[in-house]
Amino acid sequence: MEAWRCVRKGYGHCVVGRGRYPMFPHHSRSLGRDWTTPWENLQRCCWNRHISSCMRWPGHYSRAPYPYFSSRHFSLNWRPPCLFESRTQFQYCNWRPDNLSQTSLIHLSSYVMNAEGDEPSSKRRKHQGVIKRNWEYICSHDKEKTKILGDKNVDPKCEDSENKFDFSVMSYNILSQDLLEDNSHLYRHCRRPVLHWSFRFPNILKEIKHFDADVLCLQEVQEDHYGAEIRPSLESLGYHCEYKMRTGRKPDGCAICFKHSKFSLLSVNPVEFFRPDISLLDRDNVGLVLLLQPKIPYAACPAICVANTHLLYNPRRGDIKLTQLAMLLAEISSVAHQKDGSFCPIVMCGDFNSVPGSPLYSFIKEGKLNYEGLPIGKVSGQEQSSRGQRILSIPIWPPNLGISQNCVYEVQQVPKVEKTDSDLTQTQLKQTEVLVTAEKLSSNLQHHFSLSSVYSHYFPDTGIPEVTTCHSRSAITVDYIFYSAEKEDVAGHPGAEVALVGGLKLLARLSLLTEQDLWTVNGLPNENNSSDHLPLLAKFRLEL
């Protein structure tokens, strides 16, 4: 053991040289030989630049197999127990060619902090540089989309017009500090100082100031930080803030903040997904729906409905996720409904904990879903295997939830008893917003909105997927900005037919990144990006 300690400390000469361990030089050479062959196999495998630690979602890039890693892939069966601690196990590491090529073939680090509190040398290494995210300007002409990269070369047909209202929206999961600390295994790749809230919040606020969005939809907003720092800071920047904390004893929630100069507040509608009377809905996620009136003095303008949510993470509870989504859509339908029967423009943001192409994602965009025979673990696309999973029940949620299969609040005809002058009783029907008569059982879900996604989820030139979150265990897209598009956009993204008062035109979006891009700066969080999610940002135009 003394010999091993000498090697681990990096000493060139040790007590072995004095003859106490005469066989140690022989074993050292043997160690190098035993490592060479597995290393060569590992090196060859890692030259595939598309290898990723994230799981493959439907419609994934066909040239990138994205395998699950295990020791059998790399012949890494030899592992001296005294050299590796549990926190450095292979399945938690992100193997990147740029790091591996710079590492010696025999790396014998104990990953133990010294008495002065310094971090391991592998974590002290800083990844320098900032990845630039470009604006992508998108204009629609005769149902054909033109995309221009950069801030200067704007299509002339996208220039300002008189009868319009332009605004920008940011959706950002800012990573609750309590959740970060409770799930520290997801951030083993990070330097410890960048994980402190005192370091992270100034960075997050700097991003918000830089992008200067008119509307902010924030998730994982910790309640104590919101009251002490986040809300006062945003109010000083000209925002009005509304917040909905998660139910139960959860410390975070969702916030929607908007610029006083752009909007006035018409209504605030929090949505709690926990229902004590329904066993299915035993989770504490929430949503928040605001109705905002654009401030345009010279023209009449419809209100804009903005929704924000953070759906359940659990990949194996797709039944709960779909029910939470239905509850949010029902509230949006109630808030966005106009007196003439139409719906005002809608922007729906959040962390949906579902990947592109999944049944839940398709339901949002297409406006319909037949879930008959669908395993609950397949709903969000996070689970690859459906083995041992039960099938979604029909219907998914019980009648007493008060929401129909069309994702709207149901109206029941409830008998009301009144007395007449002759003391006779008669039954009179009265409308209420409480449920409910049982519908004919159907496995078809629908909603009333034609929603498009701001992002396309894949880079068109390469087919490599965009990433909105990246930590030690995955790098995928789970964050979205959906919007009710004008007709020429809807033609490219078929959805439910609905009457809209105008529609939103997507003018621009802030480009996303690939997993490979993010690992060049040591993933998320890092020195410049202080959440494990990227902020999503879009610019819209409402034609008047």
Swiss-Prot record:
GO BP annotations listed: 3'-UTR-mediated mRNA stabilization; mitochondrial mRNA 3'-end processing; negative regulation of mitotic cell cycle
A GO cellular-component term linked to this record: mitochondrion
The residue range of the signal peptide is none
GO molecular function, one example?
Answer: mRNA 3'-UTR binding
Q: Which Pfam families match?
A: ANGEL2_N (PF19339), Exo_endo_phos (PF03372)
Fetch the SUPFAM superfamilies from UniProt. DNase I-like (SSF56219)
Q: Which family does it belong to?
A: Belongs to the CCR4/nocturin family.
Q: Which PANTHER family match?
A: CARBON CATABOLITE REPRESSOR PROTEIN 4, PROTEIN ANGEL HOMOLOG 2
Q: Report the protein name in the record.
A: Protein angel homolog 2
Organism the protein comes from: Homo sapiens
Highest lineage ranks of the organism? Eukaryota, Metazoa, Chordata, Craniata, Vertebrata
Designated gene of the protein: ANGEL2
